[in-house]
């Protein structure tokens, strides 16, 4: 896949980014370079390599799958200026 000038301009318009003609021309080369690198990555043989989300092992602490209120309601509203039964009260802004 390659990117042309029309594609860069279209993406810039969709993203609502002002791009000059010189910047758009430069981006064509940069984006094609990035896509070329991604294509190289797709050629790498990863057969037998275990998928991972991090380079360091991260063991997640297991907990019971039970519904609770979190027992944090008082802590959450502690700094609120006005509360009512652990709910935030806010001034009325719409008439």
Swiss-Prot record:
Q: What EC identifiers does the entry list?
A: 6.3.5.-
Coiled-coil residue spans? none
Alphabetized UniProt keyword annotations: ATP-binding, Ligase, Nucleotide-binding, Protein biosynthesis
UniProt record, GO biological process = glutaminyl-tRNAGln biosynthesis via transamidation; regulation of translational fidelity; translation
- Gene Ontology MF terms in the entry: asparaginyl-tRNA synthase (glutamine-hydrolyzing) activity; ATP binding; glutaminyl-tRNA synthase (glutamine-hydrolyzing) activity
Database matches in Pfam families: GatC
Record SUPFAM superfamilies: Glu-tRNAGln amidotransferase C subunit
- Catalysis performed (reactions): L-glutamyl-tRNA(Gln) + L-glutamine + ATP + H2O = L-glutaminyl-tRNA(Gln) + L-glutamate + ADP + phosphate + H(+); L-aspartyl-tRNA(Asn) + L-glutamine + ATP + H2O = L-asparaginyl-tRNA(Asn) + L-glutamate + ADP + phosphate + 2 H(+)
Enzyme type, top EC level: ligase
Q: What is the purpose of this protein?
A: Allows the formation of correctly charged Asn-tRNA(Asn) or Gln-tRNA(Gln) through the transamidation of misacylated Asp-tRNA(Asn) or Glu-tRNA(Gln) in organisms which lack either or both of asparaginyl-tRNA or glutaminyl-tRNA synthetases. The reaction takes place in the presence of glutamine and ATP through an activated phospho-Asp-tRNA(Asn) or phospho-Glu-tRNA(Gln).
Similarity comment: family membership = Belongs to the GatC family.
Tell me, how does this one assemble?
Heterotrimer of A, B and C subunits.
Q: What is this protein called?
A: Aspartyl/glutamyl-tRNA(Asn/Gln) amidotransferase subunit C
């Amino acid at each position: 896949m390659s990117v042309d000038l029309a594609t860069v301009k279209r993406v810039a318009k969709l993203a609502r980014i002002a791009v000059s003609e010189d910047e758009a021309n430069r981006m064509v080369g940069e984006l094609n370079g990035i896509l070329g690198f991604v294509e190289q990555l797709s050629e790498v043989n990863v057969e037998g390599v275990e998928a991972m989300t991090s380079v360091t092992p991260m063991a997640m602490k297991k907990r019971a799958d039970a519904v609770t209120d979190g027992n944090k309601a008082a802590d959450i509203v502690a700094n609120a200026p006005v509360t009512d039964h652990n709910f935030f009260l806010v001034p009325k802004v719409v008439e």
